[in-house]
């Protein structure tokens, strides 16, 4: 059989490792904004706005309400124009079953009566990011408050 002394084995291993690293640099996966889907960009952009303040009627990082937040995020991250109100946003897109939610979907709630009054962006693991009265926050959809008020979800980008 073919046998190398320990010094030559170490040198050979170092050369093979260097060649593999070199090739992985040239031929490895490409991680650019272009490679991200619109829904991934939407989620990433929404996370940058966490802790922005709440402002009734707000549509900018200086202050958002729920639908102003989703409208702003989708416009900036996915070049998608959404209607201004939560109720009107609920009329857009394709309905999605709760068990089929994907990051970037819009989730809708009735928080003050009989019509849709709150919208947020689903980010995965039963969580969403939305502009609540305490500002832009991550929330758990499994909390009783949200479970009782859930209306449905829409997919507006892929």
Model-identified regions with their sequence ranges:
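Bacterial N-terminal signal peptides
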Residues: 14-25
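Sec-exported extracytoplasmic/periplasmic mature domains
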Residues: 47-55, 74-79, 109-112, 155-158
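Short, low-complexity, Pro/Ser/Thr/Gly-rich segments in the mature regions of secreted, periplasmic
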Residues: 145-158
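Catalytic cysteine-centered active-site loop
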Residues: 32, 53-103
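Extracytoplasmic/secreted envelope proteins and their assembly/folding machinery
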Residues: 39-43, 47, 67-71, 101, ...
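Sec-dependent signal peptide cleavage junction
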Residues: 23-41
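Bacterial N-terminal signal peptides that target proteins for export
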Residues: 3-16
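...with weaker cross-activation on analogous glycine-rich loops/strands in unrelated enzymes
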Residues: 2, 80-137
